[in-house]
A protein has these predicted regions:
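A helix-coil-helix interface module used to build multimeric assemblies
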Residues: 1-187, 191-197, 206
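Conserved small/polar residues in nucleotide/adenosyl-binding loops
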Residues: 231-233
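Short, Φ-rich (hydrophobic/aromatic) sequence segments
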Residues: 106, 225-228
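Short linear loop/turn motifs
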Residues: 48-50, 212-217
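A short, charged helix-loop
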Residues: 196-214
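Hydrophobic alpha-helical transmembrane segments of multi-pass membrane proteins
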Residues: 94, 219-226
Length: 234
């Protein structure tokens, strides 16, 4: 992202370091669910968490050798987590990790957007109240028309922002899904209850019917909602 066009709080969501931190959380969520069922030795998750340090330069160096970002990430974690790292990624495919972490990032970014729209809508409401008796020339067909108030004009903006907020929140809900169902989405290697518990810990729902990835119509709907909302703020 280009820093001068991005708010610091949004840049932080999409920083590589944050992405990798979420990758670790996604891995640990599944491992914790397995640990609670006795499939992994007790204390494994906390030992991994306490030992692991996100080292982006080291991961990139490994990736340059193995040409695979997830393998590079897991190798980086294993360098500090040691033998416990063997319990990570069991039964998962790369997209289980990447798409689920992306869903977490989208929800974080969505909270920033929603807060800003609320702030902008409140500013419009305040401005509308201030100018509810401020007369101005209305426009129709590109020419002067009957008089209105500036407050009315601003209220139209506020209402449009409200509809945009509804669209955005609906689209964000549609993206609040992840998966641990494996390469073909068949849960061949992890129990569905483990997927449910891991995703619940991350604040997500399971993709009801999946293949290798979370289906992209979810992301397309979000981008469309953002594009329409962008029109409202121009």
């Amino acid at each position: 992202m280009i820093d001068r066009y991005c708010r610091p709080e949004m840049a932080a969501v999409w920083a590589d370091e944050r992405r990798l931190a979420l990758w670790l959380e996604v891995e640990l969520a599944a491992t914790r669910a397995r640990e609670s069922r006795g499939e992994v030795p007790a204390g494994t998750v906390e030992r991994i968490r306490s030992c692991t340090r996100i080292d982006l330069p080291r991961m990139l160096a490994i990736e340059a050798e193995v040409h695979h970002d997830v393998i590079a990430f897991l190798s980086m974690v294993a360098e500090t987590a040691g033998d416990d790292a063997r319990h990570l990624h069991t039964g998962m495919t790369s997209s289980d990790l990447v798409d689920t972490a992306l869903a977490c990032q989208i929800q974080e970014a969505g909270r920033v957007l929603v807060a800003e729209i609320h702030r902008l809508r409140h500013a419009c409401w305040t401005l509308a109240q201030k100018h509810k008796h401020t007369a101005m020339v209305g426009r129709s067909h590109g020419v002067h028309a009957e008089p209105i108030t500036f407050g009315l004009k601003v209220l139209i903006w506020s209402e449009e922002l409200g509809r945009g907020l509804d669209r955005l929140q609906t689209a964000l809900m549609g993206c609040a899904v992840g998966k641990y169902s494996g390469a073909m989405g068949t849960l061949a290697h992890l129990d569905a209850a483990i997927e449910d518990d891991a995703l619940e810990a991350l604040g997500l729902e399971p993709e009801p019917i999946a293949n290798q990835v979370v289906q992209r119509d979810r992301h397309a709907a979000l981008l469309c909602a953002i594009a329409v909302d962008r029109k409202s703020t121009r």
